[in-house]
Amino acid sequence: MSGQTPYRQELRERILKAAMSEFFEKGIKAVKMDDIARRLSISKRTVYEIYSNKEELLLEGMKAAEQEFDEHMKDFSEQDNHHAMDILIEFYNCQAHRLSEISPLYFDEVQKYKRVQTYLENKHKKRDEDAYNFIDRGVKEGFFRPDTNYHIVVEVAREAVRFAMTSQLYKEHGLQIVFRNIILLFIRGICTLNGLKMLERIE
């Protein structure tokens, strides 16, 4: 992206934002490059000059969204008045809001893009490392139980999410319901009494 003019960079960001909005609303397959071009009142050729195919567009959009989320959570967690439960509740609220805006079709179809799946697998490994650091903080602050093997908890939680996605459990119950039940089940299990009292803020 080095050497791009400000206009070209702005256009790239506009295409990315429009595309991800369309993908979230309609699923990936239903959205054509023509649709994105029409929405922005530009030519399809212009879109292809910047993004050579839909997978490239999807991958960059996911990376941008993940980076924005990570930066928000980092800023939130570094504020002096926020403890582990504040951070956990903020994480829950952000994810619940995000899921409310995404069609189940998006999750069905995103699994078909190999480069995207490779990116997500690597991202999940990094998230696991962050999770252990966060849990350690929560234990020290007295919100999470010190007598729990969190490597097992994280592994089981990850498999529960994977099962919900691969079995398409969200089609029957809805994305937010599935997310809420999986997350709250594991959070309740690791919280001390102090943590459980704070957890009432999202229940």
Per-range role (PLM):
Residues K125-V153, A160, A164, Q168, ...:
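Hydrophobic alpha-helical bundle segments that form small-molecule/ligand-binding pockets
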Residues A96-F143:
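Short secondary-structure transition hinges
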Residues M1-K26, A30-I42, E56-L59:
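Basic, helix-initiating cap at the start of DNA-binding domains
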Residues M62-D70:
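Short, basic, alpha-helical segments at the C-terminal edge of helix-turn-helix-like DNA-binding modules
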Residues E60, K74-E101, V154-A157:
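Hydrophobic alpha-helical connector segments
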Residues S41-Y51:
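Short hydrophobic/aromatic patch on the recognition helix
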Residues S2, N133, R137, E141, ...:
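C-terminal peripheral helix-coil segments that are non-catalytic and often amphipathic
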Residues N93, R145-T166, V178-G189, I202-E203:
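Hydrophobic alpha-helical segments that form the core
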